Regions:
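Glycine-rich "substrate-gating" loop/helix at the edge of Rossmann-like oxidoreductase active sites
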Residues: 134-135, 164-172, 192-204, 231-233
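N-terminal Rossmann NAD(P)H-binding glycine-rich loop of SDR-like oxidoreductase domains
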Residues: 3-23
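Terminal hydrophobic/aromatic helix or amphipathic segment near a protein terminus
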Residues: 245-292
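Conserved Rossmann-fold NAD(P)-dependent oxidoreductase catalytic core, especially the SDR/UDP-sugar
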Residues: 88, 92-136
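Amphipathic terminal alpha-helices
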Residues: 299-307, 311-326
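NAD(P)H-binding glycine-rich loop region in Rossmannoid oxidoreductase-like domains
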Residues: 39, 43-88, 96, 116
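Catalytic helix-loop patch of NAD(P)-dependent Rossmann-fold dehydrogenases
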Residues: 119-166
Length: 326
């Protein structure tokens, strides 16, 4: 069958493509840049932006399934930029699916869509979107997710996946940022360091996307129009971070900063960044980051296991062993 994927050159996207190719499917990747590696694999690559609705429609014609993994992911930025990419871009994806009669859409969401200002311990998919979000990224993803869920009908079956803190070889986001901050002496434990989270090895995340597609084909009445949490946990966040740091021959993070101070500092940084129009950078702290680094956020994954047949094949210790030291 023919699969179309946005963000195919990204961390998760490449792993989804590998698994699709292993199963014998044809793959078209739609990304903002060309990736020679994908072309060597025999993947058809289209260079395009999610805002280019006509190119998105023409290039996804005659495909059987659409994996939408691309999004603007950042801890800070202009609200309109998040909205343009994550919401308008997803609307363009939905139109392309509808116009081209693509029957299955798998949307990569995030657990952050339900994270507000308090801990989540084993919450399931009945959790509502929070009234107030401290993340422009999470807010835009929640809006997009809701649109994908509502688009599910007899012509197009949709499912949303919420993978949490994906890690593994090839990661250019999570682990590199942690290591860079630590090398500069800027990484501190926020709160008491006992908070627990979900993490997820990238190959397990990719497998869930393939299984979600198969579930849409085989039992659309059960899976269609639903969201599913994905994770391997809970684990203590700072213990996990220190395992990664140790693997890179660096000393552990030991210094702490109280949550309230970090949260207020994040608020000040956001305020002054907004005032001077500084958006395209990685701020040392935001309110959302302070919350994420200090609070529990782990979820119940039983629905993904029951409905999708998803069971993580690679455990966390094995996943950590697969990390490439750079």
């Amino acid at each position: 069958m023919k699969a179309f994927i946005t963000g195919g050159g990204g961390f998760l996207g490449k792993h989804i493509i590998k698994q699709l190719l292993d199963e014998g499917h044809e793959v078209t990747s739609y990304s903002r840049s060309f990736y020679p590696e994908l072309e060597k694999w025999g993947v058809k690559s289209i260079k395009g932006d999610l805002s280019n609705s006509s190119l998105l429609e023409s290039s996804s014609k005659d495909h059987d399934v659409f994996f939408h993994t691309a999004s603007k992911v950042a801890m800070w930025g202009r609200e309109k930029d998040f909205y343009q990419t994550n919401v308008i871009g997803t609307e363009n994806v939905l139109r392309a699916c509808q116009k081209n009669k693509i029957s299955s859409l798998i949307y990569t969401s995030t657990p952050s869509v339900v994270f507000g200002d308090s801990s989540v311990k084993g919450g399931n998919e009945s959790l509502p979107y929070p009234k107030k979000s401290y993340s422009r990224y999470a807010k835009s993803k929640a809006i997009a997710e809701e649109k994908v869920i509502k688009a599910n009908d007899e012509n197009i079956k949709t499912v949303c996946l919420r993978p949490h803190l994906i890690f593994g070889p090839g990661d250019q986001n999570l682990i590199p940022k942690i290591l860079a901050a630590h090398k500069l002496g800027k990484l501190k434990i926020v709160g008491n360091g006992e908070n627990k989270v979900d993490v997820l090895y990238v190959e397990n995340a990719a497998k869930a996307h393939i299984l979600a597609w198969k579930a849409l084909l085989n039992k659309p009445q059960i899976v269609g129009g639903k969201a599913y949490f994905l994770g391997q946990g809970p684990v203590k966040l700072w213990e996990f971070i220190n395992k990664i740091i140790k693997k890179h021959n660096l000393p552990p993070v030991e210094k702490k900063i109280p949550f309230k101070i970090a949260f207020r500092l994040g608020g000040l940084i956001e305020f002054f960044s907004q005032m001077i129009g500084k958006f395209n950078y990685h701020p040392p702290m935001t309110r959302f980051v302070a919350l994420q680094l200090s609070h529990d956020h782990y979820f119940n994954h039983s629905n993904a296991k029951k409905d999708l047949g998803w069971i993580p094949e690679i455990d966390l210790d094995e996943g950590l062993e697969k990390l490439t030291i750079s």
